[in-house]
């Protein structure tokens, strides 16, 4: 249990890493001990902005920290996290994906366990209020359709769309379905880049659940939607607009809270209703909540929202999909 302020550092202060630095800086239970970036001018700029130090090496920063955010290209995640955990006894928050390979992920998980350190992974969509509202429902989905489409941008195109975009939805899928994967079928094509730009995966689980996931980075408009079907319930989740709509089949709609409208129908000579809900969702800064969770986990008050094992399992499925295309 840590009682004084947590000393946190950020390795990689580019587009996303700068926001890690900001959130540590804003917390009154954290000292932003410093930042490091391969671009020293960028590190100096962010350090100046958040009244902290910049360091010439990651190791110099790790030496004074309790926890480290690793917000660097994926190929460096393993080496940086390994040093932070084993040589400097740091807890680590790694932006997704956890590592390049499952072998690397397994080794990090083993090291963290031996050193009694946390691995938290930044699968930020898990905190989307349109998704977390489903925790109020008894979910047992049988079919899940997920779409994540985005207009083309240069950022992120150095890796296939499966590793860049689809990994978000694989992590969500594995959190919704409490069963092991039975089979995967996948296809994809290159449109603009030399790697896969559009991909579709059909995943079947051992409990019979089926999912179809499509990811594209050459779409006209942004789309991030989930459709979830189970016995007597259908939900549509818009992660982009942060809206959720739920349709429930019930004999007594008065038992369902906050119903906006109902539609009666007859099934097998029984009177039933389709009850429609559109929960009023509270919006919040999801990265800020991830950082809050990381600090609370270091203190032993919470558990990481996405731990190393969960992130490793998502990576495993993503790699299998990518290898199949």
What are these regions (language model features)?
Residues 20, 50-111:
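Beta-loop-alpha module in the N-terminal Rossmann-like domain of NAD(P)-dependent dehydrogenases
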Residues 122-129, 152-181, 196-197, 311:
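Mid-domain beta-loop-alpha active-site segment that forms a flexible
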Residues 1-50, 173:
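N-terminal Rossmann-like dinucleotide-binding module
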Residues 33, 66, 142:
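Conserved acidic residues
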Residues 1-2, 67-70, 289-325:
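C-terminal helix-rich "cap/oligomerization" subdomain common to oxidoreductases
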Residues 56, 93-94, 119-121, 237:
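Hydrophobic residues in well-ordered beta-strands that form the structural core
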Residues 99-156:
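A contiguous active-site-proximal alpha/beta segment in oxidoreductase catalytic domains
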Residues 170-247, 280-281, 286-300:
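Contiguous beta-strand/loop segments that form the cofactor/metal-binding neighborhood of enzyme cores
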């Amino acid at each position: 249990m840590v009682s004084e302020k947590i000393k946190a550092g950020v390795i990689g202060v580019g587009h996303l890493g700068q926001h890690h630095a900001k959130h540590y800086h804003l917390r009154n239970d954290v000292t932003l001990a410093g930042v490091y970036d391969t671009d020293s001018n960028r590190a100096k700029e962010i350090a100046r902005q958040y009244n902290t130090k910049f360091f010439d090496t990651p190791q110099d920063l790790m030496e004074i920290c309790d926890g480290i955010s690793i917000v660097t290209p994926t190929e460096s995640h393993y080496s940086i996290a390994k040093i932070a955990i084993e040589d400097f006894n740091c807890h680590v928050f790694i932006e997704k994906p956890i590592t390049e390979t499952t072998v690397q992920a397994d080794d990090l998980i083993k090291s963290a366990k031996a050193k009694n350190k946390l691995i938290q992974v930044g699968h930020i969509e898990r905190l989307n209020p349109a998704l977390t509202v489903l925790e109020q429902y008894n979910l047992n989905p049988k079919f899940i359709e997920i779409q994540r489409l985005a207009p083309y941008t240069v950022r992120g195109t150095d890796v296939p769309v499966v590793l860049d975009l689809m990994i978000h939805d694989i992590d969500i899928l594995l959190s919704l379905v409490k069963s092991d994967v039975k089979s995967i079928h996948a296809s994809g094509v290159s449109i603009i880049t030399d790697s896969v730009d559009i991909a579709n995966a059909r995943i079947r689980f051992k409990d019979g659940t089926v999912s179809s996931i499509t990811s594209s980075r050459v779409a006209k408009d942004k789309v991030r939607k989930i459709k979830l079907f189970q016995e007597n319930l259908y939900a549509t989740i818009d992660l982009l607009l942060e809206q959720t709509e739920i349709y429930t089949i019930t004999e007594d709609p008065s038992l369902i809270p906050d119903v906006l409208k109902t539609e009666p129908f007859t099934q097998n000579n029984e009177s039933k209703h389709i009850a429609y809900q559109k929960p009023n969702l509270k919006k919040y800064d999801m990265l800020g909540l991830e950082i809050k969770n990381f600090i609370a986990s270091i203190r032993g008050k919470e558990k990481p929202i996405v731990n190393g094992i969960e992130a490793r399992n998502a990576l495993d499925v993503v790699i299998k999909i990518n290898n199949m295309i």
